[in-house]
Amino acid sequence: QTCALPILEIVMPQISRTALVPYSAEQMYQLVNDVQSYPQFLPGCTGSRILESTPGQMTAAVDVSKAGISKTFTTRNQLTSNQSILMNLVDGPFKKLIGGWKFTPLSQEACRIEFHLDFEFTNKLIELAFGRVFKELAANMVQAFTVRAKEVYSAR
């Protein structure tokens, strides 16, 4: 009789958040796609810039800083107007980072937003130093955009 060893599967951190919001899919898509405004309202985001942009794709860099730790990561985003934004890592402290946003209309004035992110840091040291900060930031994204929508669209 052989002794089977359990296979240890390395599970990448995953973050999934969903929210129903009283704003249109188009309004929420525009907020999420407005990368240059991120430092104004995203906790931990200290800078952002668009490196390249076409109607269906955008490459953007985001600077994240918290507790004295600063990192920049760049993603290439596939854009489907008012429906989805799919992100793929170009550069940053990750071995892997994929994810995105989906905007599903529920009515003219409401939609469901979904945010999903799979990521793995390049090494344990970076994960120890930056992991909690990044997970916290990513986990609060939907909330931050919901609050931002209220500020931007309720003022109209």
Task: List the predicted regions and their residue ranges.
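Hydrophobic/aromatic beta-strand elements that line small-molecule binding cavities or substrate pockets
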Residues: 17-19, 49, 73-78, 98-105, ...
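Short, highly charged C-terminal tails/helix-capping segments
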Residues: 146-156
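Hydrophobic ligand-binding cavity/cleft-lining segments
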Residues: 8-56, 155
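Beta-strand elements of well-folded, non-transmembrane domains
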Residues: 21-25, 64-68, 79-83, 93-95, ...
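A short, structured loop/turn motif at beta-sheet edges
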Residues: 25, 51-56, 78-82, 102-112
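Glycine-rich portal/gate segments that line the openings of hydrophobic small-molecule binding cavities
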Residues: 49-91, 144, 148
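Beta-strand/loop substructures that line and gate deep hydrophobic ligand-binding cavities in soluble
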Residues: 89-140
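Short, small-residue-biased leader/transition segments that mark boundaries at the very start
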Residues: 1-5
